[in-house]
């Protein structure tokens, strides 16, 4: 009866929150324009150039460079290769997938305005993939002195037994859902640990708040899998205008979407127990996190022709205001040997989806400056510099409040993230109908500690062939970064060092409309 009364009270006043972390924030808010083959082959360095459909997403003034209406469509093959090191165990895992990563068009309206100072207005609409979330890595059969029991103990200590256990004749599903809705995420994890026999109370009184483990200390054989799916994308409505012969202006209104799904599994076994005592010898723990939502942002940009061959560009990207909803599913199975040597298997499969209250994320704003040299029909070169302060990223409830959980998370973001500087340089050489392209970029780490997450560096190459009214382009990109992946946020916090290589091949078709 005690928990029933508390259930009603908490249902009225509390929010059900999962323990979001900095990694979740970066996964959701990654906004790196994928773009067309031409755009990508020059490392996305188009800030002072324009005249390319994907460049509109980088600088909205780029649409005003077009003299004709254009349509563009791109396809990408994306391969991620992860070299994983965890407690001196190594594994390499590759994952590839195909996608339509870009589509868009612009419509040019020339000779507007009575004074003829406004040379043209351009309307554009485009879709660009901003993050490919398809990824996999795993490490098999590594030896650890830390058990998964530490995760359940970290969540359980200090919680009342009657708040993390099922009532008599209550199903696992009913108890799991009720405890999650009533008390929140840590209680739900403690419930799984208790009902699976991994943890045991010091006493079986309702007010007990101290727990020990039924997994004997020693060494543990573990295997860890992480599988991610989904995409982040950006839909842009653009208006651009040319004023006189030297000034190009643009505005983007952007809709963003997030579709992220992560599934991880930990398998653990041990032979540490002694005869005559209860020992949990095997654990299989599965977690699935799904996050999806939408956001809104604007961009303001300008390009100035200082001379016939020299251009400057500047862009302001507003924060993206996201609204995110998360869902989780869990499964836990254990095998134990009791004091008499008999074996038992416990399977906790709630068959329930936890839907958590929506929350908002405000990403950092960004400022970009660009310089380009255009050598008539012979070629061009462009340099972009961007600055983005990740420490200003902020979580809030859907009502705009910063509760205790989000206050702690925002404080962690402020203390661990920093200003990221990005540098891109791209060049194109033209020879009759052929174009040859190359680029290089450095995307600064959002972390103050670059050992936690390194800079992302890479190069790109590409070619293009121009027909009478259309162009076909092909690009090759290769990027590298290293980062640490925590197995869990509490207890079992070992870190896997991941060396990630990303190879992307794109094909684009562009045509005059």
Predicted segments with their positions:
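Bacterial Sec-dependent N-terminal signal peptides
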Residues: 1-25, 513
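Active-site-proximal flexible loops/turns
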Residues: 9, 66, 259-261
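Outer-membrane beta-barrel porins/channels
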Residues: 20-34, 108-513
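N-terminal targeting signals for Sec/Tat export/insertion, comprising classic cleavable signal peptides
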Residues: 30-48
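Outer-membrane beta-barrel translocator/receptor signature
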Residues: 37, 49-58, 64-137, 141-142, ...
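Short, charged, low-hydrophobicity "junction" segments
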Residues: 43-51, 412-415
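Short structured motifs
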Residues: 58-59, 493
């Amino acid at each position: 009866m005690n928990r029933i009364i508390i259930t009603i009270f908490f249902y009225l006043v509390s929010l059900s929150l999962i323990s979001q972390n900095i990694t979740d924030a970066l996964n959701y808010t990654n906004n790196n324009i994928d773009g067309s083959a031409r755009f990508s082959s020059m490392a996305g360095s188009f800030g002072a150039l324009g005249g390319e459909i994907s460049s509109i997403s980088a600088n909205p003034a780029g649409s005003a460079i077009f003299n004709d209406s254009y349509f563009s469509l791109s396809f990408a093959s994306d391969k991620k290769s992860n070299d994983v090191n965890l407690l001196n165990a190594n594994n390499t895992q590759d994952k590839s997938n195909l996608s339509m990563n870009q589509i868009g068009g612009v419509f040019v309206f020339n000779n507007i305005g009575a004074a003829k100072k406004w040379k043209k207005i351009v309307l554009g609409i485009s879709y660009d993939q901003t993050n490919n979330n398809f990824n996999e890595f795993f490490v098999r059969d590594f030896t650890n002195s830390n058990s998964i029991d530490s995760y359940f103990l970290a969540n359980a200590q200090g919680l009342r037994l009657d708040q993390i256990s099922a009532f008599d004749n209550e199903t696992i599903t009913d108890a799991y859902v009720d405890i999650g809705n009533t008390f929140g995420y840590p209680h739900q994890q403690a419930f799984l640990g208790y009902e699976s026999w991994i943890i045991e109370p010091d006493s079986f009184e309702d007010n007990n708040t101290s727990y020990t483990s039924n997994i004997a200390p020693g060494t543990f054989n573990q295997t860890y899998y992480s599988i991610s799916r989904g995409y982040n994308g950006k839909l842009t409505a653009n208006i651009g205008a040319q004023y006189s012969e030297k000034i190009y202006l643009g505005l983007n209104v952007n809709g963003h979407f997030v579709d992220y799904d992560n599934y991880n599994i930990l398998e653990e076994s041990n032979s540490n127990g002694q005869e005559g005592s209860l020992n949990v010898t095997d654990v299989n723990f599965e977690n699935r996190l799904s996050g999806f939502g939408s956001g809104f942002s604007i961009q303001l940009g300008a390009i100035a022709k200082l001379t016939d061959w020299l251009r400057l560009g500047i862009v302001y990207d507003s924060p993206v205001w996201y609204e995110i909803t998360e869902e989780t599913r869990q499964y836990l199975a254990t095998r134990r040997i009791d004091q008499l040597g008999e074996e038992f298997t416990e399977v906790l499969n709630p068959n329930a989806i936890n839907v958590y209250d929506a929350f908002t994320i405000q990403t950092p704003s960004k400022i970009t400056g660009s310089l380009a040299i255009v050598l008539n029909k012979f070629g061009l070169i462009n340099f972009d510099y961007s600055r983005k302060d990740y420490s200003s990223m902020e979580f809030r409830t859907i009502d705009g409040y910063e509760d205790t959980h989000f206050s702690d998370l925002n404080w962690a973001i402020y203390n661990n993230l920093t200003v990221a500087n990005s540098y891109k340089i791209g060049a194109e050489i033209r020879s009759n109908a052929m174009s040859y392209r190359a680029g290089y970029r450095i995307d600064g780490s959002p972390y103050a500690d670059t050992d936690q997450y390194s800079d992302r560096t890479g190069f790109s190459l590409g070619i293009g062939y121009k027909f009478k009214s259309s162009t076909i382009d092909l690009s090759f990109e290769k990027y590298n970064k290293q980062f640490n992946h925590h197995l869990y946020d509490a207890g079992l916090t070992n870190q896997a060092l991941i060396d990630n290589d990303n190879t992307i091949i794109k094909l684009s078709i562009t045509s005059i409309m």
